[in-house]
Amino acid sequence: MKKIVGFTSGYFDIMHPGHVMMLKECKRYCDYLLVGVNEYKTKTKQPDGRYKNEPIWTPHERLYMTDACKYVDEAFLYDGEKELYKFLKNNQDNIDVRIVGADHKEHPFTGEDLNINVIFNNRDHDYSTTNTIKE
């Protein structure tokens, strides 16, 4: 029987319980969870027009922590939305489901035009990197 391959992505900067909850939920939809870690090192504008703050951990530190999560089968770095789109386009036949944050239901996201089944995950917690930094 074919294994279901799932994909999700993010910055995973200052890994917190909310990230782990999200990855656990992602793993429920697949047998093999592939996670892209955005390597961007500076404040960046997202496809939906929002901005992400400059990461605190280096890309390799964020990759290390993400890959160590027991729900992640494989993690890799990608350098920005153009590289993510290229990866998704080249692998759309190998990815059975893409799990995207529920906040993207109302906003555009990279690769939404590709032939990959999309599931929007829940965010039923108050954890956030921004709030953690403020505390």
PLM feature segments, named:
Residues 1-135:
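Nucleotidyltransferase catalytic core that binds NTPs
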